[in-house]
Amino acid sequence: MSMLCYTLIIAFLIGIWAAPKSEDNVPLGSPATSDLSDTSCAQTHEGLKTSRNTDQHHPAPKKAEDQELGSAANIIVDPKLFQKRRFQSPRVLFSTQPPPLSRDEQSVEFLDNEDTLNRNIRAKRETHPVHNLGEYSVCDSISVWVANKTKAMDIKGKPVTVMVDVNLNNHVFKQYFFETKCRNPNPVPSGCRGIDSGHWNSYCTTTQTFVRALTMEGNQASWRFIRIDTACVCVISRKTENF
């Protein structure tokens, strides 16, 4: 009987010693630890993703110099505005650099200095010699490319804002106007050259015409007709005879 009791006690102790260990004592590399690592990695990835999204919603502040760009250069113009040929004028030019000189060599505002002007005039005289055929202009005019034109009058006589710089396809173009005006209202003491001062009063004056230019209307760019100087003409009137 006592032998049977000892046998049962030994079998019970062996059963307890051979029981499975708890998950708290699971060795590294076991499935329980792998699940925990995966969960921790997922939480870390989620934290990084949340931080990245937060950075996107709250970007870093821009530099002051980036915020102080010219208002005209920041206005992006739709390229479709330039697809219609009826909006183009030979006296309006959009360019990234100053236009070339006019044929009469009087558009000197874009030249570097007086020496450059003299060299250009001498070169032109050598290439195209001028022959004195007795032909003179009634009025002396000067033609120049005008830059930085900001104000003008439209076809209704109202003042409008002219765009100086145009942002087109990430390139900044300047709007130039080719204007012609009188050099002197009285090229000769009597008025216009070649006019009979005994019977006529005369003087030279600048006339204007309308060209399509890119203007600002609210916060949008639009085409409008504006006045610019385009010619110098002679105005005459008959003298009254005193009897």
Curated annotation (Swiss-Prot):
Disulfide bonds join 139-204, 182-232, 192-234. Gene3D superfamilies: Cystine-knot cytokines. One of its GO terms (molecular function) is growth factor activity. GO terms for cellular component: axon; dendrite; extracellular space; synaptic vesicle. The keyword Ubl conjugation does not apply. GO terms for biological process: cell surface receptor protein tyrosine kinase signaling pathway; modulation of chemical synaptic transmission; negative regulation of neuron apoptotic process; nerve development; nerve growth factor signaling pathway; neuron projection morphogenesis. Its main location: secreted. Expressed by the venom gland. Pfam families: NGF. Keywords: Cleavage on pair of basic residues, Disulfide bond, Glycoprotein, Growth factor, Lipid-binding, Metalloenzyme inhibitor, Metalloprotease inhibitor, Protease inhibitor, Secreted, Signal, Toxin. Residues 48-69 are annotated as: Disordered. The keyword Cell wall biogenesis/degradation does not apply. It is found in: Secreted. Residues 48-66 have a biased composition (Basic and acidic residues). Glycans are attached at residue 148. Residues 19-125 form a propeptide. Residues 1-18 form the signal peptide. Nerve growth factor is important for the development and maintenance of the sympathetic and sensory nervous systems. It stimulates division and differentiation of sympathetic and embryonic sensory neurons as well as basal forebrain cholinergic neurons in the brain. Its relevance in the snake venom is not clear. However, it has been shown to inhibit metalloproteinase-dependent proteolysis of platelet glycoprotein Ib alpha, suggesting a metalloproteinase inhibition to prevent metalloprotease autodigestion and/or protection against prey proteases. Homodimer; non-covalently linked. Belongs to the NGF-beta family. This is Venom nerve growth factor 2. It comes from Oxyuranus microlepidotus (Inland taipan). The lineage of its organism: Eukaryota, Metazoa, Chordata, Craniata, Vertebrata.
